[in-house]
């Protein structure tokens, strides 16, 4: 499964560094997305040969991209909504279970607070009922700079 147009129209990420396949649902305060980790992805060749596990940093990135999708919707409704998401803070990341090639995960992000243009968010990743990851993070939305 490749990323839906719904995803690629909102955020600038593209394969091979796009880790959201589809948006499942949205609310005013959050978003739920889905991702299937495909065995043919090149990072599995080195992490780890013969015993592939999805790198934790990529699991976090998938959560951050879900946060970017949420913010892109909010920015689209604001004046001058074009821009890119910038991750500004990561805190309290906890990994509880590994993710293997072929696993499909659900990612949920929720807005916790908005202060001075920074969105504080929480994110979780699950495989079925098994919690894989929880992380707190903050994102800013950067408008494009004028060209000289």
Give, region by region, the residue ranges found by the protein language model.
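A residue-level detector for short acidic-glycine micro-motifs
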Residues: 22-25, 92, 97, 111-113
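Short amphipathic alpha-helical face segments that pack within enzyme cores
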Residues: 58-66
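Catalytic strand-loop segment that frames the active site of acyl-thioester-processing enzymes
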Residues: 15-54, 59
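Short aromatic-glycine motifs in intrinsically disordered, low-complexity regions
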Residues: 2-14, 80-82
């Amino acid at each position: 499964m490749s990323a839906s147009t719904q995803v690629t129209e909102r955020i600038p990420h593209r394969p091979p560094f796009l880790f959201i396949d589809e948006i499942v649902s949205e609310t005013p305060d959050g978003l739920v997305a889905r991702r299937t980790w495909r065995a043919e992805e090149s990072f599995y060749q080195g992490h780890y040969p013969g015993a592939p596990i999805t790198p934790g940093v990529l699991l976090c990135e998938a959560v951050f991209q879900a946060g970017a999708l949420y913010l892109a919707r909010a920015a689209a409704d604001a004046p001058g909504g074009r821009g890119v998401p910038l991750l500004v803070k990561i805190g309290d990341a906890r990994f509880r279970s590994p993710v293997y090639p072929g696993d499909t995960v659900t990612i949920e992000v929720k807005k916790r607070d908005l202060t001075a243009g920074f969105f504080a968010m929480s994110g979780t990743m699950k495989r079925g009922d098994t919690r894989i990851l929880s992380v707190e993070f903050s994102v800013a939305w950067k408008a494009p700079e004028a060209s000289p």
